[in-house]
């Protein structure tokens, strides 16, 4: 019976493994075959004069990345991966790989990112790449555990909508019978509707779509968003929830993904310290204007260069708070004593924005006023506004980019590396 490679120790008497031929070295009278499965690598040592002739013939026929089955005796070997080797009694080629390979899974020959993404099924066999997705799996597992333990209800909202939920134009139109429809850019309005339904604490992990013509290392046109909405709290409450979640995720990854962390060479992986600094927008602009190459003034959005300048100053995860109402969405709650400022925030990594959120406007008339101030027609938002007429509780929430979280956590150079099959303005296959 086949066993995972990582369960085989130097003391294991015998084993059957099935995996991919990672490397093959034939030294004449002695051959070495490295077999890889998702749990690790084991060395198969073939002394040709001491094994059956058919085993030596099979070894010669194996091409790299073929799927092979090996049954044999395990022996301690200090120079081999894991301190053990497998001496074969039988070798079978289960599935022969074509040659040449589009890319080198053993990573001895570097490949461009486009080549890797074009051949993602091969690229994902590389231990460093599979480590990324093992950690991403742990991130999403930890996220669901955190929300379940804190009394949240998971929801799944529609990704086909009739209008722009955020009021913008960055939408992908789709053919939907005789109607006009779009791919949803955010579950924002649906989350708020569930506050009117009395769910009080909801979350969703799902795709969002943005028709933005970016071509950068941090933007995608299809991304995974982790969203929450909470009743009877304010922006400060959900900011604390966000900080607690981030630290919980890091702790879970640190505890459960040591092998993947090692595969990525992350010797400095560490859980962020408590108490993410809270930097007012006005102070963030002062930092950026003093050090940024681009001109920036109060009332401007914070672009890439400004993010970089502020991030270098802060040096850790932090919040930018108290944004001008003029540059935040219509549903962000303004301060009662200063309506020009709203209860909105971004959570930032020194490299990029990770999350955006706010306390929401819950009063129907104020929300209509806010929508109109943004130059939008409230009549186009009737399906959204209607719940606010029937007892909407105070509430707040945020959205967190899963890919950006993984990218910054692991120090990846490009957000596409954190997605199995990324979608950007140039890529729709595979």
Swiss-Prot record:
Its cofactor is Mg(2+). Its main location: cytoplasm. It is found in: Cytoplasm. Residues 188-191 are annotated as: Aspartate. Keywords: Aminoacyl-tRNA synthetase, ATP-binding, Cytoplasm, Ligase, Magnesium, Metal-binding, Nucleotide-binding, Protein biosynthesis. L-aspartate binds at residues 166, 210, 356, 360. One of its GO terms (molecular function) is RNA binding. Aspartyl-tRNA synthetase with relaxed tRNA specificity since it is able to aspartylate not only its cognate tRNA(Asp) but also tRNA(Asn). Reaction proceeds in two steps: L-aspartate is first activated by ATP to form Asp-AMP and then transferred to the acceptor end of tRNA(Asp/Asn). This is Aspartate--tRNA(Asp/Asn) ligase. It comes from Methanospirillum hungatei JF-1 (strain ATCC 27890 / DSM 864 / NBRC 100397 / JF-1). The gene is aspS.
């Amino acid at each position: 019976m086949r066993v995972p490679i990582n369960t085989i120790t130097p003391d294991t008497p015998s084993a059957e493994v099935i995996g991919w031929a990672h490397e093959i070295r034939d030294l004449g009278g002695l051959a070495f075959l490295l077999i890889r499965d998702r749990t690790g690598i084991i060395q198969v040592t073939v002394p040709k004069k001491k094994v059956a002739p058919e085993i030596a013939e099979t070894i010669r026929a194996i091409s790299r990345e073929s799927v092979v089955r090996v049954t044999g005796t395990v022996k301690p070997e200090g120079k081999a991966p894991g301190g053990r080797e497998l001496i074969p009694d039988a070798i079978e080629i289960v599935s022969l790989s074509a040659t040449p390979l589009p890319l080198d899974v053993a990573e001895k020959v570097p490949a461009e990112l486009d080549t890797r993404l074009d051949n993602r099924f091969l690229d994902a066999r590389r231990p460093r790449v599979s480590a990324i997705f093992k950690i991403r799996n742990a991130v999403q597992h930890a996220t669901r555990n955190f929300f379940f333990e804190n009394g949240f209800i998971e929801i799944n909202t529609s990704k086909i909508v009739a209008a722009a939920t955020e009021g913008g134009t960055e939408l992908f139109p789709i053919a939907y019978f005789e109607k006009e429809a779009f791919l949803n850019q955010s579950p924002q309005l649906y989350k708020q509707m569930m506050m009117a339904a009395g769910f009080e604490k909801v979350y969703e992990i799902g795709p969002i779509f943005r028709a933005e013509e970016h071509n950068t290392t941090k933007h995608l046109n299809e991304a995974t968003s982790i969203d929450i909405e909470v009743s009877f709290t304010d922006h400060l409450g959900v900011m604390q929830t966000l900080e607690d979640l981030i630290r919980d995720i890091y702790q879970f990854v640190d505890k459960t993904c040591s092998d993947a962390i090692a595969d990525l060479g992350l010797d400095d992986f560490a859980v962020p310290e408590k108490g993410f600094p809270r930097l007012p927008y006005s102070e963030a602009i002062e930092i950026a204007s003093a050090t940024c190459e681009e001109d920036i003034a109060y009332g401007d959005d914070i672009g890439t260069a400004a993010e970089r300048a502020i991030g270098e100053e802060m040096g850790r995860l932090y919040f930018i708070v108290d944004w001008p109402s003029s540059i935040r969405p219509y549903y962000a709650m303004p301060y009662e004593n200063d309506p020009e400022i709203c209860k909105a925030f971004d959570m930032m990594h020194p490299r990029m924005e990770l999350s955006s959120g706010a306390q929401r406007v819950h009063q129907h008339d104020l929300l209509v006023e806010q929508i109109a101030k943004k130059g939008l027609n409230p009549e186009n938002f009737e399906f959204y506004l209607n719940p606010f007429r029937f007892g909407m509780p105070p509430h707040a929430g945020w959205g967190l980019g899963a890919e950006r979280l993984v990218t910054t956590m692991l120090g990846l150079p490009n957000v596409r590396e954190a997605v199995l099959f990324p979608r950007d303005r140039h890529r729709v296959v595979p």
